């Protein structure tokens, strides 16, 4: 299958490429800077690299006409009116160029929590479903994997004693999902007609409070349980800036994570399991896997969860 990826530098995009290659797909990466991409990704030799800024339609290299499917993984979480307009323009240009190919299917990621989602993201979904390809939206809460925004945040929190956490996060209930399971769902949905023109909530098997998740994560990293200090308030902007400054996580991904921590984010339906019944990692398994492979994993060797 010939698959176009936009947003290849996002967390999921970076890990999706080697998985698709491993499954035998022909991967086409649309990037703003071809030289930078080729120099910084070891798998660049195995994919087709096209240049183009989705905010500038004329900069986009011609796409092959025989593209089968596409994944739109551009982050759309920064909540400003100016960014909303840019997010819409990016999606419109994407649909314009993809509409000139044989592409039958587009997959994008969304947010389980409607309260955490915002108009820019919902508008992008409307634009993506306006073209001729079928659209599949996979809504997630917290994604767990080595280098993910969630685990980078946990690492920051537990690196200091005592741990300082805003009060609004402590009792928030979440349904975290392993990054590898997100990748499996994306790959399994590609050109799967049962997934056409549908939205799915995807999550792991656990529903946990943020405090429970933090304690589980501490248990995989520390021999002594540190104390926890609860702050009365911490703004999304400040939290996102701190995470963006102290880790490799982008501001958009950090903001998405922080917004999710304000509200319960639990799957409202599980119909994806009727289509794709892959085994799912628990939060503890995901955290342990990330810890065990920390420092040894790269963009090409994220371990895959094998089906029995």
Language-model segments: which ranges?
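Mid/C-terminal beta-alpha module of Rossmann-like enzyme folds, strongest
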Residues: 2, 188-253, 264-308
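N-terminal Rossmann NAD(P)H-binding glycine-rich loop of SDR-like oxidoreductase domains
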Residues: 3-25, 29
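N-terminal Rossmann-fold cofactor-binding loop
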Residues: 30-35, 53-54
């Amino acid at each position: 299958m010939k698959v176009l990826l936009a947003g290849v530098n996002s967390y999921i995009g970076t890990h999706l490429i080697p998985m698709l290659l491993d499954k035998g797909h022909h991967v086409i990466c649309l990037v703003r800077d071809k030289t930078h991409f080729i120099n910084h990704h070891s798998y660049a030799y195995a994919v087709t690299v096209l240049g183009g800024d989705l905010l500038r339609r004329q900069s986009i290299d011609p796409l092959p006409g025989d593209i089968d499917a596409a994944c739109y993984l551009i982050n759309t979480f920064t909540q400003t009116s100016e960014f909303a307009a840019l997010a819409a323009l990016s999606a419109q240009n994407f649909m314009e160029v993809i509409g000139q190919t044989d592409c039958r299917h587009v997959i994008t990621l969304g947010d389980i929590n409607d309260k955490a989602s915002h108009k820019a993201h919902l508008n992008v979904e409307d634009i993506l479903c306006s073209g001729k390809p079928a659209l599949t939206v996979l809504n997630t809460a917290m994604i767990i994997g080595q280098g993910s925004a969630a685990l980078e945040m946990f690492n920051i929190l537990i690196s200091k004693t005592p741990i300082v956490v805003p009060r609004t996060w402590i009792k928030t209930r979440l349904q975290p999902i392993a990054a590898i399971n997100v990748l499996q769902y994306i790959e399994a949905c590609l050109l799967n007609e049962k997934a056409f023109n549908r939205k799915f909530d995807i999550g792991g098997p656990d529903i946990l409070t943020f405090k429970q998740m933090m304690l589980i994560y501490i248990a995989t990293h520390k021999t002594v349980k540190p104390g926890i200090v609860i702050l009365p308030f911490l703004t999304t902007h400040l939290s996102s800036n701190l995470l963006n400054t102290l880790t490799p996580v982008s501001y958009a991904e950090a903001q998405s994570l922080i917004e999710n921590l304000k509200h319960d984010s639990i799957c409202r339906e599980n119909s994806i399991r009727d289509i794709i019944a892959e085994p799912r990692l628990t939060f503890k398994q995901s955290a342990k896997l990330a810890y065990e492979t920390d420092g040894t994993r790269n963009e090409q060797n994220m371990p895959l969860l094998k089906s029995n």
